[in-house]
Swiss-Prot record:
Disulfide bonds join C13-C65, C114-C120. Coiled coil: none annotated. It comes from the Eukaryota. This is Cysteine protease inhibitor 5. Keywords: Disulfide bond, Protease inhibitor, Thiol protease inhibitor, Vacuole. Its main location: other. One of its GO terms (molecular function) is cysteine-type endopeptidase inhibitor activity. Belongs to the protease inhibitor I3 (leguminous Kunitz-type inhibitor) family. Gene3D superfamilies: 2.80.10.50. GO terms for cellular component: vacuole.
Length: 151
């Protein structure tokens, strides 16, 4: 399912990265994201697999929350916003998988969180406090499959 930005806990700025699922209360449209490449030598409209990227929600926001759209992983290993482009701890990569969609598409990917001082960890899904959250996991076989759609 699509990912979206949501406010859990009545914060000033929404910071939860959630996943729509095939469960009626969690169906819906996603929030568009932008992949910001770390290296200026990566140019063009295509983000290649295993390229270092920062992930940023492409959403209208208030002045107060303008810096709260970049993804990061918090101390609970949850994917949230509040990261910074250029911060070595907020790096992600996209990796191709061998999965095929029911429609036959072979363009199925997984996301990895790859802080500079540690190895990469898969992004998987988990319910936390009743919400479908994105989390980092150590198991290479546990991940959410993503299909990217140009917004």
């Amino acid at each position: 399912g699509a990912v979206y930005l949501y406010n859990i806990g009545n914060l000033q700025c929404p910071n939860a990265v959630l996943q729509h699922m095939s469960i009626p209360q969690f169906l819906g449209e996603g929030t568009p994201v932008v992949f910001v490449r770390k290296s200026e030598s990566d140019y063009g409209d295509v983000v290649r697999v295993m390229t270092v990227v920062y992930i940023k929600f492409f959403v209208k926001t208030t002045k107060l929350c303008v810096d709260q759209t970049v993804w990061k992983v918090n101390d609970e290993q949850l994917v949230v916003t509040g990261g910074k482009v250029g911060n070595e701890n907020d790096i992600f990569k996209i990796m191709k998988t061998d999965l095929v969609t029911p429609g036959g598409s072979k363009y199925v990917y997984k996301l990895l969180h790859c802080p500079s001082h540690l190895g990469c960890k898969n992004i998987a899904g988990n319910f936390k406090n009743g919400y479908p959250r994105l989390v980092t996991v150590d198991d290479d076989k546990d991940f959410i499959p993503f299909v990217f759609i140009k917004a």
